[in-house]
């Protein structure tokens, strides 16, 4: 396995080096270096609030130390349920209690019994390897962005109707910009910790990465990947001491505003609501519809499920129906569009209430181990990978964790965490 990894990283490093040596990228990085210096020495930068702005937030123990604890997934899930206009059914209430209990046991209790050995045995990853992989992923995503736009003959943000013409086989590689950003940001975090760049330089590079993500993902008209990029930068920056607590709180408010705003204007463009409708009501109605879907899925799934893994397996490319289209078919609604089933929708349909308890426990354990590993090592890579899986767990509260590339991210994280568990136990 180490031979395969070494061969792949060596090849990717060579590709990355060749691109960096090219005239185009030499010019780009020279210009960016100039802009970075202007930013650091800018007069306007001094007008920006200091790290101690809204200092009362730092006195809150939960915000300062546990804001991105894995339990935030349960908090977000609870808020999402409260947004709905109607209440949950009695059966779904039991399912939710099992889900919350399983997740809590998985993330808060079970990790205490692991990774208590010698931390020197924990796997270490080279900064250059992670940067090169991230850089190449971003390049691939940019190439497929232009291919996707050309395939539909326009920019989906400007023509919302053509967004549904986008082909998943072309847009899926575009979303590689998310893990690419995660790895490159983690590499910059390593540079900052090694004092190779200043905090101001690290902050500028984080902002630039976020700007690139916003530019490409927003033009495609996708909201969830855009929020993923935003969350990843915030989480890595917070645990790397690059982003202050008050910026996290303000960023969260901006993120909520973006969710409401993008959803509202998209609905206006698609004529599903009028301009007289409240943006808050638009968010509530979306949450209410998703909760209604979950109520139906819970009724269908029962105690032991009906599809027994077929919904999760439908995430694999080439399946007749994707998992969210399968949801539409199961609830006898519309099979030609995707329907979001929430974080536990797939679990309850595949394996029922029993499956929800077990799968939420597994998800909680993955996040709990990732959180513990990040805290013990303070390592740039483990900070990045935790940010990646926590981000998609939070966003999965509405959408579910059903996209094949996201499942691959979790599979990689599980593989790395298991190796570390075995190494530290021995």
Residue ranges and their predicted role:
Residues 1-122, 202-215, 229-269, 412-418:
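N-terminal "leader" segments that precede or initiate the main folded domain
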Residues 206-207, 227, 249, 357-358, ...:
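Hydrophobic alpha-helical transmembrane segments
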């Amino acid at each position: 396995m180490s031979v395969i990894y070494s061969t792949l990283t060596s090849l990717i490093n060579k590709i990355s080096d060749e691109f960096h040596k090219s005239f185009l990228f030499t010019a780009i990085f020279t210009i960016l270096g100039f802009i970075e210096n202007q930013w650091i020495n800018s007069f306007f930068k001094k007008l920006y609030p200091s790290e101690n702005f809204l200092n009362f937030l730092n006195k809150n123990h939960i915000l300062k130390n546990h804001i991105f604890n894995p339990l935030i997934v349960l908090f977000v899930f609870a808020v999402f349920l409260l947004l709905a206009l109607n209440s949950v059914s009695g059966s779904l209430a039991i399912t939710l209690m099992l889900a919350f209990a399983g997740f809590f046991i998985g993330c808060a209790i079970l990790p205490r019994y692991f990774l208590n050995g010698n931390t020197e045995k924990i796997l270490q990853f080279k900064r250059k390897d992670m940067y090169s992989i991230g850089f190449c992923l971003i390049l691939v995503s940019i190439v497929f962005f232009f291919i996707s736009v050309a395939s539909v003959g326009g920019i989906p943000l400007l023509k919302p109707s053509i967004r549904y013409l986008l082909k998943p086989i072309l847009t899926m590689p575009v979303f590689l910009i998310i893990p690419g950003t995660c790895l490159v940001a983690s590499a910059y975090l390593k540079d900052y910790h090694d004092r190779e760049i200043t905090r101001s330089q690290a902050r500028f590079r984080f902002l630039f990465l976020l700007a690139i993500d916003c530019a490409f993902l927003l033009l495609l008209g996708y909201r969830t990947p855009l929020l993923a990029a935003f969350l990843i930068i915030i989480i890595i920056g917070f645990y790397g001491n690059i982003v202050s607590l008050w910026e996290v709180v303000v960023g969260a408010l901006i993120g909520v505003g973006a969710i409401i705003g993008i959803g509202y204007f998209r609905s206006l463009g698609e004529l599903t609501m009028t301009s007289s409708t409240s943006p808050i009501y638009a968010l509530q109605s979306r949450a209410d519809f998703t909760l209604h879907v979950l109520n139906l899925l819970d009724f269908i799934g029962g105690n032991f499920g009906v599809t027994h893994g077929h919904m999760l397996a439908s995430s694999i490319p080439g399946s007749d129906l994707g998992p969210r289209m399968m949801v539409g078919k199961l609830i006898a609604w519309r099979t030609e569009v995707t329907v979001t089933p929430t974080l536990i929708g797939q679990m309850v349909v595949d394996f029922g209430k029993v499956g929800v308890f077990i799968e939420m426990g597994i998800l909680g354990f993955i996040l709990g181990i990732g959180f513990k590993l990040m805290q013990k090592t303070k390592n740039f890579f483990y900070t990045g990978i935790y940010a990646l899986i926590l981000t998609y767990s939070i966003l999965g509260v509405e959408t579910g964790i059903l996209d094949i590339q996201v499942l691959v991210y979790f599979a990689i994280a599980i593989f790395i965490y298991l190796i570390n568990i075995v190494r530290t136990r021995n």
